[in-house]
Amino acid sequence: MPVSRIKVKNRHLKKKAKKPLAFYKPATKFAGAVLIAGTLTTTHELLLQQTSPMVQAATNSTEAFIESIAASAKPVADSNGLYPSVMIAQAILESNWGSSQLSRAPYYNLFGIQGTYQGKSVVFKTQEYLNGKWVTKDMPFRVYPSFNQSFQDNAYVLKTTNFGNGPYYAKAWRANAATYQAATAALTGKYATDPNYGASLNRIISQYNLTRFDGASSAGTSNSGGSTATNTNNNSNTSSTTYTVKSGDTLWGISQKYGISVAQIQSANNLKSTVIYIGQKLVLTTSSSSSNTNSSTSSGNSAGTTTPTTSVTPAKPASQTTIKVKSGDTLWGLSVKYKTTIAQLKSWNHLNSDTIFIGQNLIVSQSAGSSSSSTGSSSASTSSTSNSSAASNTSIHKVVKGDTLWGLSQKSGSPIASIKAWNHLSSDTILIGQYLRIK
């Protein structure tokens, strides 16, 4: 997927804006198509179709939009070392709260990124102020299957854009920005030349408390959390734990700590997304072979873990292997190389899709500590045997110059359709250095 440079905004046009947060702008039409002001390429600059002035949606509507995009924004931002609050605020600002034509179905382009995505694009007429005059151009904008892919692509732009002097947006990364304000300041003048761009994002983040989404990508060890565990039946084989979410928690981190799946936590708490909030109470149900009724309460000043007197203890990783994604890597290739499954890789790394990015750190193997649950040990053994068997029957090929899918299918005796399915290819295009399963 080619890196698309987000062009800087035209300062001349900003003199017309009365307020940094003028989300609903009067529209301009040109030959029946939406215009983009100046040399702008982001949806923040996309003029809406002619409508009467609109008032910002009521609180329940804005919160509904925030919740709908946060479900995609948080895991993407977390896995790429970005601030979820900043990414959500950008989506709000760039898409006029999801009301811009480009951000709505069937385009789902929240950030106005130009180019094509998996071969799909939509053309809008744009106007650029060049050499003292307005020039009209037809420009393609990427079309995504959903908001999730739009967030992933925006993260890709923020992480990989490089004009020869290092990553262009590196100062906006969480590793280099101590606060979200530092990240928005780093975007000002680069992602957008509007001098008020960072302030606009900060106001949105503050007004709608978007920092609640800024928990780290894995569970922390803060001393502010607490939980209560109770075995609800004398002869029950389960124990119910009430956990209080603290800063840094994610569903994935909690699931790893307590040895249960994210899906189980979502089901037990009727959660429709992976978004959780500081102070939220979560019911955690774990397997137990104890026949006694026991209860245990951990202090609010503890490390946020419980010590229920049952035979099952939270799963604690003993060791793990982490790799940095390089060109040609795929989840399938990594699963075969490290003798695991795609589902396990996605679970370890809290991924909602099969998309990974160059430079991204991924956990590719993880061994758990001892557990009193013999069932879990048996399952792990069975899984390992199954993975080893599957790996022995496959063949992984590194693409070299001159390779084609047809040639590889002839070499391996596998149909082209099978090779494409195994490697999640949407076209016949393959890249030098790419790893492909061919058998």
UniProtKB/Swiss-Prot annotation:
Physiological role: Required for cell separation during growth.
A single Gene Ontology CC term: extracellular region
InterPro entries hit by this protein: Glycosyl_Hydrolase_73, LysM_dom, LysM_dom_sf, MGlyc_endo_b_GlcNAc-like_dom
Region of interest called Disordered, as start-end residue ranges on this chain: 218-241, 287-320, 372-393
Transmembrane regions listed in the UniProt entry: none
Lineage of origin: Bacteria, Bacillati, Bacillota, Bacilli, Lactobacillales
Gene3D superfamilies: 1.10.530.10, DNA polymerase, domain 6 (4.10.80.30), LysM domain (3.10.350.10)
Enzyme class: hydrolase
Signal peptide: 1-57
Known EC number: 3.2.1.17
Recorded family membership: Belongs to the glycosyl hydrolase 73 family.
SUPFAM superfamilies documented for this protein: LysM domain
Protein name per its UniProtKB record: Probable N-acetylmuramidase
Residue intervals of the LysM domain: 241-284, 321-364, 395-438
Catalyzed reactions per annotation: Hydrolysis of (1->4)-beta-linkages between N-acetylmuramic acid and N-acetyl-D-glucosamine residues in a peptidoglycan and between N-acetyl-D-glucosamine residues in chitodextrins
Disulphides: none
Biased composition, class Low complexity, residue ranges: 287-319
Keyword Cell wall biogenesis/degradation: yes
Natural source organism: Lactococcus lactis subsp. lactis (strain IL1403) (Streptococcus lactis)
This protein's domain notes: The LysM domains are thought to be involved in peptidoglycan binding.
GO biological process, one term: defense response to bacterium
Subcellular localization: Secreted
Pfam families recorded: Glucosaminidase, LysM
Gene Ontology terms, MF aspect: amidase activity; lysozyme activity
Alphabetized CDD domains for the sequence: LysM
